[in-house]
Amino acid sequence: GTIEKLADADAFRSIGLDRRKALWEVSALSDKPVGMFEGQPSASVNEVQLELPLITDAGHVVEDYATTGLSLKAHPVSFLRSQLHSMRVMPTSQLPKLKNGDFVAVAGLITVRQRPGTAKGVLFITIEDEAGFANLVVWGKVFEQYRRDIVQARLLMVEGRVQIEGQVIHVIANSCYNLSYLLKTMADVPNPDMALSTLSRSDEKDPEEVFHKGRNFR
């Protein structure tokens, strides 16, 4: 019902109930209509107080994306930054500090893929991380070489050269890699089988399936 959807969207945090606690409380509510003077608390009823496992910050972001398509808590890529740093991937905020022709590696969630018919096979991709956006240019030969990674990725890593024209910065892709598997590390239970056997965590979703696919335009 409506209350359950609000709980799943983490709408009760302002009254001290996080998503998991709110869903637990909502599950105890009756679906039957209650009269005006009925359903009052009874001193004779002792509810069992359970300590539910806390959802991690990353887990909350996953759930936010699953229910509302975005999160105001944090950007998903921020939880992967240490892993990306080990791959020498820099935040998009560093792009303006580079010089034309510098080699760079960036990664982010794909928001747009665009392959205009007038562009002679060139693919334009926009990715976003916790710092901002990066505009990528993928030439036809590179696209054919990395087609599967580009088409299937939610989280894409690109290595290439910086191209600066006035205030506009592009990354000309040399190679593209699908890093969507890293999104799974954001789950509270990395092993999906554990979630099936743990009732208190049955609300968890697969992060790799939650984050939006890029929009495709021609």
Could you tell me what each predicted segment is?
Residues 110, 154-167:
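Flexible glycine-rich surface loops and low-complexity tracts that mediate binding to linear polymers
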Residues 97, 103-104, 149:
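Residue-level "contact hotspot" at macromolecular interaction interfaces
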Residues 116-141:
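OB-fold (S1/OB) nucleic-acid-binding surfaces
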Residues 103-117:
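Structural detector for short beta-strands of small beta-barrel domains
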Residues 142-157:
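Short nucleic-acid-contacting surface segments enriched for D/E, G, S/T with interspersed K/R
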